[in-house]
A protein has these predicted regions:
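Hydrophobic ligand-binding cavity/cleft-lining segments
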Residues: 1-46
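Short, contiguous strand/loop micro-motifs
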Residues: 16, 77, 124-125
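Short hydrophobic/aromatic-rich motifs at helix boundaries and adjacent loops
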Residues: 1-2, 36-39, 61-63, 109-112
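Generic structural detector for well-ordered beta-strands
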Residues: 11-15, 42, 52, 92, ...
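Glycine-rich portal/gate segments that line the openings of hydrophobic small-molecule binding cavities
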Residues: 32-36, 42-88, 97, 101, ...
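Non-catalytic surface loops within mature trypsin-like serine protease
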Residues: 16, 55, 71, 95, ...
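Beta-strand/loop substructures that line and gate deep hydrophobic ligand-binding cavities in soluble
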Residues: 81-135
Length: 147
């Protein structure tokens, strides 16, 4: 097992139309307004940006994200990531009942030296930290959609 590789999956059911949810998710530079753990997003061009994240643990992750796929008709947004994390992440938004089901998938390798150094003993803590970040994202997105 490569202790520095992670695969995450989160599913959120939201009481908003899929097109509205997708519209919020595709405006990546606005994530810091509703997602507390996304501290900053700086656009480099129309497909690339630098994001800074910090959840519960006292460290910051910095990644450069480049859009790989934007397909509103399929409800898919996908990006490649380099920097402290290297890999990809994807949002898939589909109709579900009267609202939307949001699937977030991510496969990354940790590149940040400190996190690599503590890969084995710190793995459960890093997974819990990610879960807290995703919980904050779900709550923030729900609140943003309620406005």
């Amino acid at each position: 097992m490569d202790w520095c590789r992670y695969r995450f999956r989160s599913v959120w059911d939201l009481p908003a139309p899929p097109s509205r949810v997708y519209g919020v998710l595709e405006r990546v530079d606005e994530y810091p307004r509703w997602w507390p753990q996304v501290r900053q997003v700086t656009r480099l061009d129309d497909r690339t940006g630098v994001a800074r994240f910090r959840s519960f643990l006292p460290y910051e992750l910095v990644v450069t994200a480049q859009e790989r796929r934007r397909a509103p008709e399929a409800g898919v947004l996908e990006m490649a990531m380099t920097g402290d994390l290297e890999g990809w992440a994807r949002w898939t938004v589909q109709p579900r009942g009267g609202g939307a089901r949001v699937l977030y998938e991510q496969e990354v390798e940790v590149r940040k030296a400190l996190m690599r150094r503590f890969a084995v003993p710190g793995r459960p803590v890093l997974i819990a930290n990610h879960a807290l970040m995703m919980r904050g994202g779900r709550r923030g997105l729900s609140a943003a959609l309620a406005v």
